Amino acid sequence: MNLVLASTSPRRKELLTHIGLGRSDFTFEQVAPDIDETPRSGELPRDYVQRLAAEKAQAGLALCSDMSQPAVLGSDTIVVLENEILGKPVDDADAKRVLRALSGRAHTVMTAVALANANHTAMRLVETLVRFCVLSDADIDAYVASQEPMDKAGSYGIQGLGGCFVESIDGSYSCVVGLPLVETRQLLSEAGII
């Protein structure tokens, strides 16, 4: 099987590379699936993130029609606060609003991973509880000025400057980054890829 990552995220690419544990025979391609990420009316966060991961994997599979036996990995990450999905910010003001909402509180990060081939799609969902320290307006302004939050669900990246705001996590660190390693390895192992 030929492994394909249906994402152009540098964070997901780096994490998937780790799964190979440095083996030269662990390789993968990347494609950029284009899907509608709009939540459906009444859709629960768990259902939403799993649907997007599956749709990304299926859209990636469609982009690999010229490849022999593709196995496509799709993933999506959301931040949930009081059952509200906090996606990527639309502008600086939105990022600041989200960071103020997260300040001093716990929230859930959900990452779904789907592995699709021509016959089957397998799925894993991982949830991690993240608690933020209290953020000052100066912290929020400086962080947003760095532009780091602008392409990240929940307006922060735990692996970057945003990690300074994380008081504690209960669960998978790699889930918060965007690709839960243990569960992704399980999917790849079950499919005979590793």
UniProtKB/Swiss-Prot annotation:
GO cellular component: a single term: cytoplasm
Pfam families tied to this protein: Maf
Transmembrane helix is among the record's keywords: no
Co-factor requirement: a divalent metal cation
InterPro entries (alphabetical): ITPase-like_fam, Maf-like
Positions of the record's site feature: Important for substrate specificity: 11, 77, 159
EC nos: 3.6.1.9
GO molecular function, one term: dTTP diphosphatase activity
Keywords (A to Z) from UniProt: Cytoplasm, Hydrolase, Nucleotide metabolism
Active site: 76
Catalytic activity: dTTP + H2O = dTMP + diphosphate + H(+); UTP + H2O = UMP + diphosphate + H(+)
CDD domains, per the entry: Maf
PANTHER family for the chain: BIFUNCTIONAL DTTP/UTP PYROPHOSPHATASE/METHYLTRANSFERASE PROTEIN-RELATED, BIFUNCTIONAL DTTP_UTP PYROPHOSPHATASE_METHYLTRANSFERASE PROTEIN-RELATED
Family: Belongs to the Maf family. YhdE subfamily.
NCBIfam families named in the record: maf
Name of the protein in its database record: dTTP/UTP pyrophosphatase
Native species: Shewanella oneidensis (strain ATCC 700550 / JCM 31522 / CIP 106686 / LMG 19005 / NCIMB 14063 / MR-1)
